[in-house]
Every structure is written in structure tokens, then in C-alpha cells.
């Protein structure tokens, strides 16, 4: 543990930020998995799952958890996956 008070506070802040970022990333991954599963099963609510995944990705990008390009890549790959399963 750090000896300087400001560094102790910084460590606590970083731990909180890490927990938040991990939770948001987990939510994004779960939404993508659900959308892919719906695409595999030809689910009737596929568009709902895909839009939910896009919403979670966009929210993570706007909060600064994911980089803009990373979010775009995730959304693009999800769309390509869904498109390949619909053919």
C-alpha cells in the first residue's frame, strides 16, 4: 500500500473505476452473446437483441469505457455475424 495520502486515494479511485468498467464490459459482452445466440436459433426477437447490444455498446463508448473504434468494431462484427446467419 502507498504511504502518500493522495496515492492511497488514487488507488481507491482506480479500484472503483476498474470495478465499474468491468461491469460495463461484462454487460456489453452478455448483450453480444445473447444477440449471437438469437441469430443462431433464428429467434423472432433477433432485432430486439441486436438493438439492445448496439445500445449497450454505444453507452459504453459514450461513458469512455470503450474506445470509439473498439465500439464500432464490435457493432460491425455483430452485424456481420447476424447477416451471415440470416442467409
From Swiss-Prot:
GO cellular component: cytosol; small ribosomal subunit
Region annotated Disordered, chain positions: 67-87
GO biological process: translation
SUPFAM superfamilies reported in the protein's UniProt record: Ribosomal protein S20
Keywords, sorted A to Z: Ribonucleoprotein, Ribosomal protein, RNA-binding, rRNA-binding
InterPro entries registered for this protein in UniProt: Ribosomal_bS20 (IPR002583), Ribosomal_bS20_sf (IPR036510)
Gene3D superfamilies per the UniProt record, alphabetical: Ribosomal protein S20 (1.20.58.110)
Annotated GO MF terms: small ribosomal subunit rRNA binding; structural constituent of ribosome
Keyword Transport: no
Keyword GTP-binding: no
Free-text function comment from the UniProt entry: Binds directly to 16S ribosomal RNA.
Family note: Belongs to the bacterial ribosomal protein bS20 family.
Name the record gives this protein: Small ribosomal subunit protein bS20
Gene name as annotated: rpsT
